[in-house]
């Protein structure tokens, strides 16, 4: 007895191919945070829907932003920053 799928997943699309004006730059940490988990890992392209070309660029820019201290390497740092600012 075969099981039928209850739903059909919607087709994923690359945000950067759809919107040519959306910059993919290490200085735009707000955009890059959408492609990182709360633990600091880069999300795979099969989940985000980005094309292979833009996933390579995205990975490079995330790594640059980490080196420039615009993004954190691991989780837990944002709470540390809040504690230091409260002192």
Curated annotation (Swiss-Prot):
Gene3D superfamilies: Ribosomal protein S18
Pfam families given in the database record: Ribosomal_S18
rRNA-binding as UniProt keyword: yes
Record-level GO BP terms: translation
GO CC terms in record: cytosolic small ribosomal subunit
GO molecular function terms noted in the UniProt entry: small ribosomal subunit rRNA binding; structural constituent of ribosome
Keyword terms, alphabetized: Ribonucleoprotein, Ribosomal protein, RNA-binding, rRNA-binding
Keyword presence, Transcription: no
Record's function text: Binds as a heterodimer with protein bS6 to the central domain of the 16S rRNA, where it helps stabilize the platform of the 30S subunit.
Subunit structure: Part of the 30S ribosomal subunit. Forms a tight heterodimer with protein bS6.
Assigned protein family: Belongs to the bacterial ribosomal protein bS18 family.
Protein name: Small ribosomal subunit protein bS18
Upper classification of the organism: Bacteria, Pseudomonadati, Thermodesulfobacteriota, Desulfovibrionia, Desulfovibrionales
């Amino acid at each position: 007895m075969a099981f039928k799928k209850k739903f059909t997943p919607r087709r994923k699309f690359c945000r950067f191919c759809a919107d040519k004006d959306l910059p993919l730059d290490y200085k735009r940490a707000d955009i890059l945070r959408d492609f990182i988990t709360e633990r600091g890992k880069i999300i795979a392209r099969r989940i985000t829907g980005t094309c292979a070309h833009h996933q390579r660029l995205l990975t490079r820019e995330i790594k640059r932003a980490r080196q420039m201290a615009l993004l954190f390497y691991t989780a837990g740092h944002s709470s540390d920053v809040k504690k230091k600012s409260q002192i």
